[in-house]
Amino acid sequence: MSTMIEVRDLTFAYPAQEEEQQQGTVALRNVDLTIEKGSFVAVLGHNGSGKSTLAKHMNAVLLPSGGRVFVAGMDTLDEQQIIAIRRAVGMVFQNPDNQIVANVVEEDVAFGLENLGVPSADIRRRVDEALAAVGMEEFTRHAPHLLSGGQKQRIAIAGIIAMAPQCIVLDEATAMLDPAGRREVLATIQTLHRDMGITVVLITHHMDEAILADRVVVMNEGSVAMDGTPTEVFTRVEELEEMGLTVPDTVQLLHRLRAAGYDVPLDALDVEACADAVFGALN
């Protein structure tokens, strides 16, 4: 795989809020991270761990105080590359209402393309394809404000897809959704990754969401504390708990069964695999 995003010794401090403060809050400290094209990476951490600050560096919403961030080989500190960087990496944020800019779904999805001066025929095709990709093609003429939270986030994702990015970063994109909305958005993300080969970076505090990824990065106090497959990360239960993180229910169950003497695999992380493992151990 080739590199999509490369973070080199990244340090970032938010500006001081008061004049008497000499230094701002340091949110990231010497972070090194490489994300390969076509991968699905979940970034976990409690509030204040630096995960959202890291996400905002991935398409130059924030710029490094120290170190470098490269997106598809482009340095985010190079002002001439900012537009190309933001076209390469699209971002979906936490509040779906803050991302709606039009009164009709298809117009909202077309907004970015129109600003780029894309020909009308191409806009029509790309909007239709993007809405189909997120399963919202039947809502073309609907008013976005009448949609559910999950549907609004899927519209936001469609607007990003229409711009043909190489990577999508979702910064706590399911945090304000009900369980049904979360399932809708997560299913959409999985489809885009599997069928379109889009690189996905999922910033989340929901452990069960991270199970879906190929790789899990855990942030703590502005640094990378863990980096590995979901199985590698979630078997380090005590370390995660020390960082204020609770492992998925499936992991807790498997560890309790193992402690009770049952021969269950610790890598059966999703609900279906866990159920099969428990059934097999008890029979």
Regions found by a protein language model. Give the residues of each.
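Catalytic Walker B motif of ABC-type/P-loop ATPase nucleotide-binding domains
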Residues: I168-D171
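Helix-to-loop junction immediately C-terminal to a conserved catalytic motif
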Residues: N59
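Conserved ABC ATPase signature
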Residues: A143-L147, Q151
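Conserved ABC ATPase "signature" region
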Residues: A121-F139
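Conserved ABC transporter NBD signature motif
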Residues: G67-L77, I85
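The feature captures the beta-strand-to-loop junction immediately N-terminal to the Walker
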Residues: L44-H46
